[in-house]
Amino acid sequence: MKINQEINSSKLSKFIAKSMDGKKAENIIIINLKKIKNSVTDYFVLATGNSNIHIESIANGIEYDVFKKFNEKPWNKEGVNNSEWVVIDFINVVAHIFNPDTRETYNLEKLWGDGDLINNNNEKK
């Protein structure tokens, strides 16, 4: 699946961050990975949910909002059964929704620290 020509990855990453914010996700960060050689995607969008139900709600909200606006479904979705870390893969943009402990353990911000970190207000960190 390739993202619809009308959607660019930057626009989609910001839209996903907005969707997360609408579901009261916390600590929303976009990581621009375009400059990193051999990166797996253009952008990661990271967020934290405060319970399994909250994480599931954020994930479902992203799918619904992206489909409603862009008529696109994710290529893959993982982690829904345990809701500690849900990954929604739109190929060029990958959304990660964590519980607080899992986010701290895997610390993708540090792991992919060569990318540009952008907070939800589009400000580079």
Describe each model-derived feature in a short phrase.
Residues 88-90:
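Active-site beta-strand termini and strand-to-loop segments that position acidic
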Residues 104-107:
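Switch/connector loops and helix/strand junctions flanking conserved nucleotide-binding motifs
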Residues 46-48:
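Short hydrophobic/aromatic beta-strand micro-patches
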Residues 1-40, 50-86, 100-101, 111-125:
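Polybasic/polar functional segments that serve as interface/processing modules
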Residues 42-44:
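Catalytic metal-binding acidic patch
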